[in-house]
Amino acid sequence: MAYKDSYLWRLRQAVGSDLVLMPGAMVAVQREDQRVLLTKRADDGTWCLPAGAAEPGGSFARTAIDELAEETGIEVSERDLIPFGCLSEAEAHTIHYPSGDVTHCFALLFLARAWRGDPVPDGDESTETRFVSLGEAPDPLHPPTAHALDLLSSYLGSGAFQVH
């Protein structure tokens, strides 16, 4: 869904650029060689995990599935989404957009090891896709993604759900 068709856009029409609290999801698509898919954001040129805000009536899983498909063309089923963490602390996940909008996001983080399709940037939100090793993420890295990749690394080492 295009941003101008989204719930967040409609909310922004009412509140302007003021701080908005927003639930959402991020997805770490991981290949067998352990590399994770990142996309390059069209708005600020940073690299990030596919992610987005929830729509009314949607779930965290539905948000993850929809955002992954919209931003990369990759399809994943709900049964293949593994929740591995939650990113909610304000200093880790408050985003200041180039437009002046400010959003404190609360994201459930998912790992996907099974999916269909090849990643293709949508040209609207993302301009490039790349699989990278966890220790070699490209610069500049979107700050919430840096935290999410740290949580993923901890999850992969411990198997325990991660919270930040």
Language-model-derived ranges and their functions:
Residues 74-118:
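Active-site segment of metal-dependent pyrophosphate-handling enzymes
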Residues 1-26, 100:
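Acidic, metal-coordinating catalytic segment for phosphate/diphosphate chemistry
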Residues 39, 84-86, 122:
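Residue-level detector of high-confidence beta-strand sites
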Residues 29, 109-113, 130:
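Short, well-ordered beta-strand micro-motif
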Residues 25, 52, 66, 79, ...:
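Structural detector for helix-capping/boundary residues
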Residues 45-46, 117-164:
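Nudix hydrolase/Nudix homology domain
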Residues 31-71, 75:
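Conserved Nudix-box catalytic region and its N-terminal flanking loop in Nudix hydrolases
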